[in-house]
């Protein structure tokens, strides 16, 4: 990463985006991408990005925002049309935290921007790179990838830019088209207009059909309107079941002359009688309905009981019929079967067997604490075992039997065919005298005592192998050296002998020549 930072040029502008996920510090390259940087700073000065959302999040790729409509289709630059692309040889999308301008095509840049989350070489030379996220604020950008997104890469709860702050502005000549205060006032006016328009919306006027010659027919054909008629608030008198007079009626009655009081009283009496009669009729109707309901319930219960009885009777009759059929079949089969076919016992159901089992257990159950009989039986059995003698005849018979072909053991029990033994001697007491004898435990394994010798284990130590290999290598080298030294010594001895012999022969020759010279001198 250090060499990547070394290749990138120095920044000369800085903007802080205060978002709901935390602050994001963006350093801008004003020299390398002047138009994109100027556009971004001027939009921040005008408060264009305030309360806008990051409408697109692609984990592992980018986070996109800067659209005031929040759809990804809006946004405009400070220039009249989209400004052209700005590429630089030292600026590439080769890591995360780089800020670029979003566009729909070549030289079609607006207000939307994106922040990369990983290396994206495919964006190089296609989108203008004009900034980078500085410091630990990059982790606030990475935090946005943890949000839930839908199929269209749109977050369900999108993060929002609350406001923007310009820390370093390299362009002194930037004049915002509208200040933040004016923009707030403009938004308030728009809200007021929207409210006024909503209030001005009136209900659709009713057609005056009575002015037409065929108004009555048109009124019949006209569908009922869904407008809610305004009604006055009702008092408690309107919801009373009795025909009690309302306060307005009482006032009108007071205003009437006294002569009409008698007629009014008589009318009230008639009304009271009528109400009493109506109440009595209603009570009788209720009683009659209750009686009918009770009668219906009783009939239903009786029908259910009859159905259950019928079903139980039918089931019992069906079971009995099946049993009778089975008996008949067994009789016919027994008559027609030969003597070779053995007679089968009568089949009983599992329920009957279980009942017999529990009944026998219940009969055999003894009283609590009465176990003397069991103890006596145990003692007699132990006595029988201790006094039992080995059946010598059986052992001798086994020894006399020929050895088996597989194991070579006389009287081998493994090779004996038990299926051919039609009758077994149940009274054979030879098993009592039999003894189970195991091999003597010499190592004391049953007592968990390890008495093994060292010779029982094979110790494989890799270090011994390594030491042995080193020793062999040393001896081999030593043998080579010793052989070479002995050869050298032999060669030296041989040379020494040869030199001595040559020297001796030379001295002998010299001595002979001197003696010859002396002899010649004497003769002369």
From Swiss-Prot:
The keyword Isomerase is assigned to this record: yes
A Pfam family annotated for this chain is Pro_isomerase
Q: Where is the composition biased (Polar residues)?
A: 329-338
Q: What is its EC number?
A: 5.2.1.8
Care to name a GO molecular-function term for this sequence?
peptidyl-prolyl cis-trans isomerase activity
Keyword terms: Cytoplasm, Isomerase, mRNA processing, mRNA splicing, Nucleus, Rotamase, Spliceosome
GO cellular component entries: catalytic step 2 spliceosome; cytoplasm
Designated name of the protein: Peptidyl-prolyl isomerase cwc27
Organism the protein comes from: Rhizopus delemar (strain RA 99-880 / ATCC MYA-4621 / FGSC 9543 / NRRL 43880)
């Amino acid at each position: 990463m250090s060499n990547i930072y070394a290749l990138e040029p120095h920044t000369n502008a800085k903007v802080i985006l205060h978002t709901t996920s935390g602050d994001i510090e963006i350093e801008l390259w004003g020299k390398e991408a002047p138009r994109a940087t100027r556009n971004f700073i001027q939009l921040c000065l005008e408060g264009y990005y305030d309360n806008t959302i990051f409408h697109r999040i692609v984990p592992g790729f980018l986070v996109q925002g800067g659209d005031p409509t929040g759809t990804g289709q809006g946004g405009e630059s400070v220039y009249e049309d989209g400004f052209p692309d700005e590429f630089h040889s030292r600026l590439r999308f080769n890591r995360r935290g780089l800020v670029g301008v979003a566009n729909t095509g070549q030289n079609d840049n607006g207000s939307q921007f994106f922040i990369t989350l990983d290396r994206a070489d495919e964006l190089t030379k296609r989108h203008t790179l004009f900034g980078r996220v500085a410091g630990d604020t990059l982790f606030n950008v990475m935090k946005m990838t943890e949000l839930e997104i839908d199929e269209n890469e749109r977050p369900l709860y999108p993060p929002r830019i609350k406001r923007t702050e310009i820390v370093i502005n390299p362009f002194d000549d930037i004049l915002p088209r509208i200040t933040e205060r004016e923009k707030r006032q403009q938004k308030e006016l728009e809200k007021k207009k929207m409210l006024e328009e909503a209030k001005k919306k009136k209900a659709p006027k009713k057609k005056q059909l009575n002015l037409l010659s065929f108004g009555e027919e048109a009124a019949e054909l006209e569908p009922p309107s869904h407008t809610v008629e305004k009604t006055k608030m009702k008092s408690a008198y309107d919801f009373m079941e009795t025909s009690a007079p309302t306060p307005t009626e009482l006032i009108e009655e007071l205003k009437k002359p006294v002569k009409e009081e008698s007629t009014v009283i008589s009318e009230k009496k008639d009304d009271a009688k009528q109400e009493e009669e109506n109440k009595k009729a209603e009570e009788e109707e209720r009683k009659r309905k209750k009686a009918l309901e009770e009668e219906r319930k009783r009939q239903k219960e009786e029908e259910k009981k009859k159905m259950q009885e019928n079903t139980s009777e039918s089931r019992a009759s069906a079971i009995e019929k099946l049993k009778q059929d089975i008996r008949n079949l067994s009789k016919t089969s027994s008559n027609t079967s030969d003597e070779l076919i053995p007679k089968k016992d009568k089949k009983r159901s599992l329920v009957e067997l279980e009942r017999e089992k529990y009944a026998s257990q219940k009969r055999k159950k003894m009283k609590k604490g009465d176990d003397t009989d069991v103890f006596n039986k145990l003692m007699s059995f132990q006595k029988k075992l201790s006094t039992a003698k080995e059946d010598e005849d059986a052992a001798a018979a086994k020894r006399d039997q020929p050895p088996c072909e597989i194991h070579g053991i006389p009287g081998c029990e493994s090779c004996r065919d038990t299926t051919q033994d039609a009758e077994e001697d149940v009274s054979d007491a030879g098993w009592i005298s039999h003894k189970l004898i195991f091999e003597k435990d010499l190592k004391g394994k049953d007592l968990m005592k390890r008495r093994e010798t060292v010779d029982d284990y094979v110790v494989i130590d890799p270090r011994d192998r390594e030491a042995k290999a080193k020793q062999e290598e040393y001896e081999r080298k030593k043998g080579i050296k010793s052989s070479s030294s002995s050869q050298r010594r032999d060669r030296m001895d041989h040379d020494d002998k040869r030199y001595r012999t040559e020297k001796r022969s030379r001295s002998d020759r010299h001595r002979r020549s001197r003696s010859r010279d002396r002899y010649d001198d004497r003769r002369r």
